Amino acid sequence: MTPSEKFLQKIGLKDAISEPNAENNSIKENNRRSFLKKSALGGISLGGAFLFTPIEEIIAQSTQKVKRFSGPSDLQITDMRYCIIQNVGRTPIIRIDTNQGIYGLGEVRDGADERYALMLKSRILGQNPCNVEMLFKTIKQFGGPARQGGGVSGVEMALWDLCGKAYNVPCWQLLGGRYRDKVRMYADTPEAPTLDEFKLKIKHRLEVQGMTWLKMDISIGEVKDIPGALNNSKFWGKNLAQWNGGYMDYANTEHPFTGIQINDKGLDAMANIISEVRSVVGYEIPLSSDHYGHFDLNNAIRFGRKVEPYRLAWLEDMVPWQFPEQFKMISDAIETPVLTGEDIYLLSGFKPLIDIHAVDIIHPDLATAGGLLETKRIGDYAEEHGVAMAMHFAGTPVSFMASVHCAAATQNFLALEHHSLDSEWWDTLVKTTDGRKLFEKGFANVPLTAPGLGIELVDEECKKHLLPTDKSYFAPTPDWNDKRSHDRPWS
């Protein structure tokens, strides 16, 4: 055997010509132990023993401090389990387990059904979680807009968390590296019973919580009781609830089809609310707006023109995202930036808006859009077309941190929403693996070295906030193990 062959055999890249006997094995093992013992005491001198040390002992010494978190090539998905946190109604968290003891965390969109994720379990069992893109392409056909995208997106989050843990790198590193060490947040600020109370809440956001970007809700619901403010509003009932109701109720009737119009008196009243908030915020702090109510294109343009003196950072979801031509008409008619996107699934859903520059800013929610990589692709595509990206978020710290990693890795990013700043327990659901806070004074901390998403659940805290109708906590889900369909979407 040549010296080269002996070397390859010793490092395991060439099979031995003959089986070694037990005596030789014993001698080698004693030599190895003796070597490691000596190395631990004093190390190997390059000028001395190193030149005469067997190659296997050199390899053992040089690699004894290498971190082996798993064998990524041999990883297999063995289970998917869930719990449901009572946050913004209900927010399911999923856990994908493997044959090597490491697991990944993901989140099904706030307000969504855990079964959007569980139905995907049979399609990923036995697969290597590090093949993220292949698995994503396998399951993405089962997603859809809004909460329907939560299952695919939650699984994708968990796969990246697993992959980062397997290779001992943060998720942002797997996405191509980071542009920033801190991620700017914007504070969602819901309506208050009175304008004075709302102004106090805004002041608290700035002076106590240290936020540097705010968002306010301003809707026709705030002026509905002013005589002559609205036209045709009483047809829909007294409260104009935007989220709850039957299929034919106001909440589920798209903006162009309600027949509601805002009279000048109503526009004046809504503009006055924004003016009062600006008097507290000033003009240096970006102030965005949302949740105007369901009224048509023409009234959206009238409202947009009315509030232009207050230089809002954006007008959000003026009409449903499915109408890109209407968004284009609004953005062409006013100077304030126009934004949408929290309910759009996949890059293909954003392209009709981006391609015609119907909006100035896109606004994906990573838990709907398709997960980390797809959301980065959306941001990159928008950047190529001169469109910025903000990010919607209203879930638990799991999806929050997934969004932080994506935001860190996407250049045209502006700000990430935080929807639970007033919760006393939201950030107790997890602990960071690098020991830092999730966020401080308006900025989220990007995990610089922590593998995966950089968080672990705090079980005792999560159990305090489980959905009352489902107190299970990562219980087995064997009913979802078997695949029962032929999934190919083409013939």
Explain the meaning of each model-derived region.
Residues 122, 127-131, 305, 311-314, ...:
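Shared catalytic-loop signature of beta/alpha-barrel
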Residues 28-37, 45-67:
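N-terminal twin-arginine translocation
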Residues 99-172, 486-490:
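Metal- or metallocofactor-binding catalytic centers and their adjacent structured scaffolds
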